[in-house]
Structures are given as C-alpha cells and as structure tokens.
Amino acid sequence: FEDWCTSDKLMEMNENFRVNVHRNLQRDSATKPLTENWSCTVVSGQEEGSLPGLFGLSFQQTSNSSSRHFQSPKKINLGPRHNCHNALMAVLAARELGVKFSESMERICEFDSPLPDRYGIEHIGKHVLINDTYNANPDSFASVINDLATNCSYPKNKLLIMGDMLELGQYSETEHAKILEQALRLDGLKAIFLKGEKFQNLIFSTQQKDHESQFDQVYALQETEDFPVALLSDLLDEESVILVKGSRKMNMEQFVDLLRNNLL
C-alpha cells in the first residue's frame, strides 16, 4: 500500500485515476509469498443540480490464475476526495478479514454524508459552502485546500475563512506557515480571512517573501463580528466556493451562520 498511501494524484471530474496495489502475503514460514495485483479506478464528478462529492469505485484483481472485477453499484457521496482513499483502505482491510467485496461496496454506498460540521457541503444562493468547522489539523487542512485546487467540480472563485490549529506545540509556526502558503497559491482566490494569533502572526513575515501582492486579499479577524459583511457582495459577485475551517475552540461555526444569514 505504500505507493498508494503516498500518492499525490487526485481525480478530476469525469477522469479516472488508477492506483496499483502490490501485496506480498507470507502465509506461514513454510510457504511462498502470495502476490496479488490490485488496480483501483476512482471516478469523480458532479451530477447536474447536485453538490460536488459524488464518486464511483472500481476494483480489478489480477493473480497468477485469475482476474476479477468489482465496482460500487451506485455513486457514493463521500464528501472530500481523501475519503476515497479511506474507503479503499477500508474495503481492502475488510477483505483481509473475509468480508466479500460485494458486501463492502453495499455498506459504503449506504454512506450518505459526513457528520455535522465535518466537510458538510451545501448551496447558499449561487455559492458552495464547505463547513469543516468541527476541528482542524495540518493534514486535514492541507487535504481540503488540495481538494479546492484540483477538483473542478467546485466553482473557480474561492474564499477561505481559516482559524488556528491548536495543540501543535513546537511545530505550530511551521505548520501554520505551510497551510497559509498553500492557500495563497490557490487559483481564483478572492480573499482569506484569518482568525487566531497563530495564522495572523505569519502575515507580516510571509508578506516580505513571495506573496506580497496577494496580501491585500488577507484579512485578520479577532471575533466573528469583525467579519466585513459589506465586502461580500464585491468578493462574491460570481459563483464561488467558500471554505470555513479551524480548530474546535476557534468557534468557526459562527462564520457559517453569518454566511447563511447574509448570502441568501
């Protein structure tokens, strides 16, 4: 699974991406390793009138003596695309425990949507809101920003409201800097709103480097009430995707309520 887990390839709408999984299984010390080759195709897309996040999964197993094919019976609403990797890992782990592919696929297809505030996607007027306010860490932040950068199911224009990631200890400044740099590289970026001293302390130091021209798009917020609602009509004059994310103690869900009340 190593190549699979470290792959940075992501799917684009109506295109496939293929991952080869090579497994060497040692069954008792007296037997030869059993090698099975797995190929998985993930198809992502958005049906007309629906929200982004619909996927199809297809497995192809090839061994020395046979070849078999399995696929999901219907589209799956997995939310962020990194959940495809999670789903594939779950399917293959279940197989090692004796669960049939057909049963695993049926169970995954029962998955409807993430839990509240965990990458919940909704339409607000003509815009797409991603409510990922339950919590945040460097991996989850990087994943969702990467999703915004590569998933053409979302509108081109992007607005980010980002709160600090807490409990990172000595790595806090480095990890916040990585996320801010990644966010500033997004195409179609309209603005970034930052809540919390960890992100805000980086603004000046980063401003002196590669993104000085972009910092007229970055705003520091002390409280939810500081959000410049009057700017929304200018920033979101076209169809946009809006991400709201931060650690639990940052109370980022308050921004979701603010957007719902002012964008309808």
Regions found by a protein language model. Name each.
Residues 55:
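A Rossmann-like FAD-binding core segment of flavoenzymes
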